[in-house]
């Protein structure tokens, strides 16, 4: 079809078959020819996760370009696989829904980001589906093989160390910076912190390296069991989910909140650290010997508290229950 110069191709003009034909370059030869994806049989257990990214809920074109959207779609799913004991990424399928007026360049950018993330973290684009819709939506299903670690939220035990694999609040700060939020304009945020925060929001890193280190430093005679989740919905929610599943109390040391070295002080900044969301760090409850080995092997990890017998809740070390700041808590609905 001939196009006038400077006129963008839109999905309505291309049609489904041409869209699928253009997406072939992101997959292995023949992968898209059939309605199913053939995966070779594995003797190991499979772990599978499905996540959605919805425009104006999980991303905005004001703050996130198409490449970043594709990257983020992969990273969110692989983060969930990592906190379930991922050994190797097999691949993903992609369900795409978008208005027919969507430019092809947007779709191409998203799949470029998807491919870049898979190239870095492993796995292939196995297939998927596309449809016309009122809102841009990506639905990703990720598949991987499970390693020897049995990571379940219900595995936390009294006496465990509560550890996270990295700092929190960066993604929320990055979003604020991209939106020119008055909060971030009222304080001198160091340039290095700005760079880290914006990258954390636009190109999150699933905690695969942290998981691999956790695996390597397990004491020899210790069982392969630990409690873990990721902090995609915020650090506090991650801690509370471990408490609920394990029926334990988490005692958190306020002085040990996992913050970037240049993180400002103040209640708002503590709230972002606790509840900003989309940090994608491992939050793990580990027996003391294993915890100490992981802390030594990976300097970016931080012990933020202990688990003890008691009701399923998170509390400060002074005995006060950690209260949620509802205006900052990350919610899907």
Curated annotation (Swiss-Prot):
SUPFAM superfamilies recorded: PurM C-terminal domain-like, PurM N-terminal domain-like
Residues the record lists as binding substrate: 58, 278, 330
Keyword Metal-binding listed: yes
Enzyme class: transferase
Example GO biological process: thiamine diphosphate biosynthetic process
Binding site for ATP: 111, 128-129, 153, 232
Function (record text): Catalyzes the ATP-dependent phosphorylation of thiamine-monophosphate (TMP) to form thiamine-pyrophosphate (TPP), the active form of vitamin B1.
Protein name (record): Thiamine-monophosphate kinase
Gene that encodes the chain: thiL
